[in-house]
């Protein structure tokens, strides 16, 4: 009797997009949380990529070894820490350019497991994503030029003459923000996995607009990453982080935002609102709110009791 279950699924599709664009989408890790609904965060360390993704009511974390062939427009991600019953899994993308500016995308998913009911179910679950995944990459690639216009990305740094621990603690303890940050009117938070937070937050913009959002956060030692999973009506996606850089005098905290505008929701800002108008609005509102939060963190961390 075989002691393992091994399966491979391959899907191909013709994309009305250049091969180089499609290749960038699956290799530039910044795109994953922004354009893929389950993606929360990914970071690279040499050829190792660490991933965090929504799964059920929680977050799954794993690592893969990435093998890049840029000239061949091919990338392979081999998981290095498979949990039983899976014993191996991988995803490979290959893009073949065509003379008319389109390309053929080929996606190959492989999974091995223990030869058991649980193993076969795990393999089937891994391979079931093939159709959805190649369709999603095609949709993104074919609308890439428009998407670039709809994405607002910026960073706001602030120096704080206090300890990194105090600032990090202020931002980590988001459930205390309604007492500490005026534009946050209510917030409920859970942390069932260490360092993984889910919270529902009510905020008010400078114009008095009320928003309710739901977010997931990954709290790493040097960075707190977030992704909104319950979004305001104007946005298709909103991701970002708080990054901490300790200096001899204190800490520089950088608030990063990447937001994708919904073009069919522009009228929420007025009948004649353009994408450029919405970009300016988001840059102002998101920056104002995050800098307000940082300035309250600054006041907290620079108090003698916390400095």
Residue ranges, per PLM feature:
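Short, structured motif recognition centered on aromatic/hydrophobic residues
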Residues: 23-26, 32, 92-94, 103-105, ...
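Hydrophobic ligand-binding cavity/cleft-lining segments
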Residues: 1-46, 131-193, 307
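A short, structured loop/turn motif at beta-sheet edges
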Residues: 19, 44-47, 67-73, 94-104, ...
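Extended Gly/Ser/Thr-rich low-complexity repeat segments
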Residues: 65-70, 211-221, 267-274
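Aromatic/basic-lined ligand-recognition segments
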Residues: 190, 196-205, 210-213
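Short Pro/Gly-enriched beta-strand edge/turn motifs at strand-loop
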Residues: 47-49, 72-79, 197-199, 221-228
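Hydrophobic, helix-prone linear segments
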Residues: 1-74, 83-88, 288-307
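Beta-strand/loop substructures that line and gate deep hydrophobic ligand-binding cavities in soluble
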Residues: 3-8, 55-56, 61, 78-137, ...
